[in-house]
Amino acid sequence: RKQLIPFGLYEVRGFISANLAAETGFDQEDLRILFEAIHNMYEHDHSASKGEMSVVSPLILFRHVGTDTDERQRIRQAKLGCAPAHKLFELVKVAKKPGVEVPRSYRDYDAAIDLKHIPEGVEVGFQTYAGIAWGKLPEDENWFHEA
């Protein structure tokens, strides 16, 4: 007999090293293809054991841009990172909604991001199926909201 977990919500965190990207030639087109692959990774992979899995939009992106007025120094800052990753991830909160005992949908969760506390030198973007919206939540996405 197959075991079945009727519903699960997974949070996935990924990182791209600016230094390694420069060494390997990883560029904006590679990034676009990666985001497209993430959005579609379950569309052609349904099975009896996994049921129906999907990626819920938007992907939340943090981009280090630096703060210095000197362009060379700003690029250096951006490559090193302007804030620790764990501090950026702490800005995103996902919690089961009050009154929901057994969640059966991602809509049974409240998802929020604290846009007021994005560190200086960091930009936040939201990758939807339509593209990336930088600095604000996309109007066509209603699951995430500003904390």
Language-model-derived ranges and their functions:
Residues 1-147:
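Basic polyanion-binding and macromolecular-assembly surfaces
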